[in-house]
């Protein structure tokens, strides 16, 4: 009986801690990144910055998005591999 009471109290305590932590952290990112038109506007971390391929670089076409700076990847022969315009 004592063990059951201890387990119930422990579960209630841990649940209360989780709910409190979740409520306090809502809408409070430490370093929010604002993305607009596919580009990172504020990023101190170089890994988060968007990199694009220059004209003439090899790219993968046909995926609905392009990693080319111009936004256009010209597909050669329908293979899905092309070059940035």
UniProtKB/Swiss-Prot annotation:
Disulphide-bridged cysteine pairs: 52-69, 59-73, 68-84
Keyword Metal-binding (UniProt) = no
Kindly indicate whether the keyword Flavoprotein belongs to this entry.
no
Subcellular localization: Secreted
The record's GO CC annotations read: extracellular region
Q: Where is the signal peptide?
A: 1-22
Tissues of expression: Expressed by the venom duct.
Propeptide positions in the record are: 23-49
Keywords, comma-separated and alphabetical: Cleavage on pair of basic residues, Disulfide bond, Knottin, Neurotoxin, Secreted, Signal, Toxin
Q: Which InterPro entries match?
A: Conotoxin
**Per its record, what are the GO molecular function terms?**
ion channel inhibitor activity; toxin activity
What broad class describes the main subcellular location of this protein? secreted
The protein's role, per its UniProt record: Produces no obvious effect on ionic currents when tested on the mouse dorsal rooted ganglia (DRG).
Domain characteristics, as noted in the entry: The presence of a 'disulfide through disulfide knot' structurally defines this protein as a knottin.
The record's similarity note reads:
Belongs to the conotoxin O1 superfamily.
The identity of this protein, by name, is Conotoxin MaIr94
Identify the species of origin: Conus marmoreus (Marble cone)
